[in-house]
Amino acid sequence: DAVELTAPQGEVTFEHVDFSYVPDRKLLQDICIEAKPGMRFALVGPTGCGKTTLINLLLRFYDIDAGRIMVDGRSSRDYTRASLRRAFGMVLQDTWLFEGTVAENIAYGCPDATREQVIEAAKRAHAHKFIVQLPSGYDTVIGEDGGTFSQGQKQLLCIARVMLTDPAILLLDE
């Protein structure tokens, strides 16, 4: 029976992982990665080389063909999918903002967050400086697609949203 991942420390290890979407056509072969708590770790490579697939495997959207993925010294398969996914904060390349204020967009994952917590998350994401220059600061209403914000500003807002949840492990997909 799967157990809850509580108080994650942030250690992630891929041990000789193989994966294929189509049988007999390996996409990833013998992948070995070790990331310790507090470590910054970057996967770099051309589009289509498997970076996002590794994230999907880590979050158990797909099962691996061989090897093991360990989180805090235990197989990721030992944890419930829901508790495993709660341990991670993720910002994708494609941003998602909704119609509402800047503060509401940042607080999306933590609706009970205080204004001070929202501002602190924005500062940690390096978004505070541009937010306070907006006509109404954190109370500026933005459209569903992010309005006139640059792609970089949209990503900073999404990073602030994740920072507010204070995940044990932060994943940034390009």
Predicted segment positions?
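ABC-type nucleotide-binding domain
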Residues: V3-E174
